[in-house]
Amino acid sequence: MAEQASSFTDRLAARFAGAQIAVALPRGEVTLEVAAADWHATCLALRDELGFEQLSDLCGVDYLGYGSGEWDTADVSSQGFSRGVEGKAVGRFAWGEFPSQESSAGAQPQQLPKQRFAVVAQLISYQHNQRLRVRCYAPDEQVPLVASVTDIWPGVNWFEREAFDLFGIVFDGHPDLRRILTDYGFVGHPFRKDFPLIGNVEVRYDEERKRVVYEPVTSVEPRVGVPRVIRDDARYETAAGEVGRSETAK
């Protein structure tokens, strides 16, 4: 598997100069990371030149708060979860609030990552018996914009609509970019890490108006139900050691 993956990454490196290529061993999972400006051209080349005729999945990813936890499990804790955990991760707050982090100058707003929103596609080549993960980061966190690939793989239509609905990622050139899971009056994008877990509106039936109404959330108090834990122990040594190769193609 490692030999096959190495040969495949050599082909990718020769074709896509400047792209980031990583291989996870021993499974041989290959990830190709390209700039958002090259997203459409890369996908087209992968289909027409490298035989990736099927896109099996496409999703959005929000890296806000990536790598930060709420409960330290590296040693014996004097503050077990049964004793309460202070919410530090994103999403633990009411609408409009934002998490903070401690620094020498006191509590400061949590820093936004330079590359927050990503689009990830899973491709399959039946003729070469090969799978490939392709990823790009939207250059603008305020308005994450990535080219649509519906003209390359028409089946991606609803996947892109889902990523738009849940993450707010805009796919330029999509023929029908509208919400697909939430209703048309929904405020915000619920899979963003800064979207409050309690939501921002609640729905009830109003007897006087004889219709469903949306109102600001007032009946739910934000709290940590399950702490965000990032474990660093033997169970994750294999996963951490699987990245066998990460290089910049030249």
Swiss-Prot record:
Compartment(s) of residence: Cell inner membrane
Main localization of the protein described in the UniProt heading: membrane
Superkingdom, natural source: Bacteria
Pfam family, one: Complex1_30kDa
EC number: 7.1.1.-
Leader sequence segment: none
A GO MF label: NADH:ubiquinone reductase (non-electrogenic) activity
SUPFAM superfamilies: Nqo5-like
Membrane-topology annotation of the record: Peripheral membrane protein
GO cellular component, one term: plasma membrane
Keyword line: Cell inner membrane, Cell membrane, Membrane, NAD, Quinone, Translocase, Transport, Ubiquinone
Coiled coil: none
InterPro entries: NADH_DH_suC, NADH_quin_OxRdtase_su_C/D-like, NADH_UbQ_OxRdtase_30kDa_su, NADH_UbQ_OxRdtase_CS
Catalytic reactions of this protein: a quinone + NADH + 5 H(+)(in) = a quinol + NAD(+) + 4 H(+)(out)
Job description of the protein: NDH-1 shuttles electrons from NADH, via FMN and iron-sulfur (Fe-S) centers, to quinones in the respiratory chain. The immediate electron acceptor for the enzyme in this species is believed to be ubiquinone. Couples the redox reaction to proton translocation (for every two electrons transferred, four hydrogen ions are translocated across the cytoplasmic membrane), and thus conserves the redox energy in a proton gradient.
Family to which this protein belongs: Belongs to the complex I 30 kDa subunit family.
Quaternary data: NDH-1 is composed of 14 different subunits. Subunits NuoB, C, D, E, F, and G constitute the peripheral sector of the complex.
Full protein name: NADH-quinone oxidoreductase subunit C
Organism: Xanthomonas oryzae pv. oryzae (strain KACC10331 / KXO85)
Recorded name of the encoding gene: nuoC
